Amino acid sequence: MTETLLIATLAVPLAAALLVTAAPSARAADRVNVAAALLTAALALVLAVLAIADAPGASARGSWFVLDPAAGVFLALVAVVGLASALLSPTYLRHAGRGWIGARRSHVFYYAAFDVFWAVLLALPLVDNLALAWILVEGSTATSALLVAYSGKRAALEAGWKYLILTTLGLAIALFGIVVLFVAVGPGGGGLSRLDWSALNAAAPGLPRETTLIAFVLIIVGLATKVGWAPVHNWLPDAHSEAPPPISAMLSAALLPTVLLIAWRTELALGPGLSGGAVRQLFLGFGLLSLAIAIPFLWRPQPWKRLLAYSSLEHMGILALGIGFGTPLAIAGVVVHVAGHGIAKSLGFYTAIPLLRQNPGAARLPARGLARTSASTAIAAAVSLVALAGLPPSPLFVSEAMVLLGGMEAGLLVVAAVAAVLLALGFLGLAHALIEALLGGRRRAGSGVSPRSARAIGALAGVAAVALVAVAVAAYALPGSSLVEALMRGAA
């Protein structure tokens, strides 16, 4: 039953990508995609619950896929963010212009690319093989680059091209690392199955340490371009700024964390054959550098979506620190942070839909004066930025505390102290941005907010606020739980 559920979860969005091409009108394409999204999310969430609960027969490995608690956590995240993006896409598309081609065909193009992109993201947490994971990550690049450039404007085309080139170069580096690792594993039966997570974990202690380290560094540095870690994050602000808001939410709240999961699984699989210090230094270096580079941009006035993009750089850095610290408390913080960031960041990008609907110029200006122009949009912006800044009762406050305490628990007091200072500076930057967005009096980018779409975003903000508080409450039960123990075991 589990295998059938897994196949159905991936098959429905792929089937929807084909069905929308036969839709007779843009409205029909909307309906097909929404129906498929509801079914896809329902299947994925059932699968995720089975995996997280470690139900009998759920934690199993197939020929190419694995269903374990880690897969369940990230699968649930991708399902929820994908569903919300699918439901809000018709609202965006009705006033988005024609994109590259005519109105109906523009809808078809958007939905077909969206559904394939979502299917790839749903598959990534479930994949049980490093080589297949690389193929899926590259597939996510191709489909999402088309969506980044959807509007057809010069800035969007440049952002899509930049995203495609830089991430493909990074993935080429990762591919070289995979080849080095495959050669190090040596000849034998099984072909590419030798790159299964469990097979790598079993073989790692017997591999040449220097070769394994070189392969590991190449793979992680290559994947870092997709995760958005500094200094290989250059595509991130432009792509998030130019993509349609539902796609920006998918990129930041779903794509970045799922690729990070692949990097994490690689670390867990090869860990027995590596020096713990070398692995730790790589993740901690990416984490601190990402925080340090993000902070100045959070302090500067930024267009709304660009501000959220730099916030993603900061939060991916926090996740890198949690993995680098590697203690149970830090790993619990990583889980909470992934969930909280996914909810808050996607809400932030959805807030751009009413901002852009009647005022496309809002994409180029910092959002200001929302409290005077649209109460619903102001509430959504406030919920998003309060959560992202880590202000209690945000679950990100709890997760950041867990990560920092985990660093102290690991004996890395200096790293934890530096991270705490950087997080405090990031908090102040986002707090200033929030005040400007709500109460700022000049260049009010929210002056053209659409009442209908603003009400929808306001309702979504209420749901998101409840979900954020629920995650914060659940976070206190996470340290020492079987879920964290399963995540620590990883590929073992």
What label would you give each PLM region?
Residues 2-112, 481-489:
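Transmembrane helix-loop-helix hairpins at membrane boundaries of multipass inner-membrane proteins
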Residues 9-10, 20, 227, 233, ...:
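Hydrophobic alpha-helical transmembrane segments of integral membrane proteins
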Residues 10, 14, 34-44, 79, ...:
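Alpha-helical transmembrane segments
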Residues 27-37, 158-170, 374-378, 454-463:
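Alpha-helical transmembrane segments and their helix-start/interface "positive-inside/aromatic belt" motifs
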Residues 43-51, 175-183, 391, 471-477:
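C-terminal TM-helix exit segments that contain a strictly Trp-centered aromatic cap at the helix terminus
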Residues 84-94, 119-131, 143-401, 405-436:
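Hydrophobic transmembrane alpha-helices and their helix-loop junctions in integral membrane proteins
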Residues 193-197, 243-245, 374-376, 427-492:
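Cytoplasmic/organellar membrane-interface segments at the starts of transmembrane helices
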